[in-house]
Amino acid sequence: MIYNNLKIFSQNICKNMLIVSTIFETHFHFNILFIQEPPWSIICLITSLSCSKGEILVGAPNYPNWLFFARLPTIQLDFLRVMAYINICLSSFCFSLCRDIINHRDILFISFFNNNICSFIMNIYSDASHSALKYFKDTEVNIINLLIMTGDFNIRDWLWDPSFPYHLFISNNLFIIADSFNLDLSLLTNSVPTRYSDTVGESDLVIDLIFLHSGLSKLNNHLIHLE
């Protein structure tokens, strides 16, 4: 079963190119990498017939043996906020970006085939305004067989963060969305923060969450890599 072979690593890297390189150097045992707030910068100058100095090539780094998935910006300031790398060892499952179903810069919706069954995985970055969640609330999206929805949701709640004493209304919206996709919140194997503050006096956070397909025990746990 492919479910036993899906090893997904997810992290908000705050547009830091060095972190991306470090992930590839140290987390090679994963075969799917979900990135939130990725680097999107000048890579090089390419030959141009219209500009003697060359045209600027903007994008994210590519790596050998990895397939790159991202919704490319449609306008200059429409920077992408999620991307994914999938190892070529999974190429036979025909992973594909489904922009015809979900087309939003904060949501990466990817399909794959296993035993002629189409399944999906989803990478999300929800900003402080919860743009991704508002998109789902305002857009009718019929999705079946979504295996995992994960990423940086930017929501604190006592339901998943014991150090936070409140329950927020936006959390209810998140659970309604997850329930519509037949997903359950995955419980941490190790109860630790997912985001450590660099500022003295600020609390560490649990805002990176994983929702898994209901009843699929093979995907029923995850843990935080402290390094």
What positions do the PLM features span?
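A shared catalytic/ligand-binding motif for oxyanion handling
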Residues: 1-227
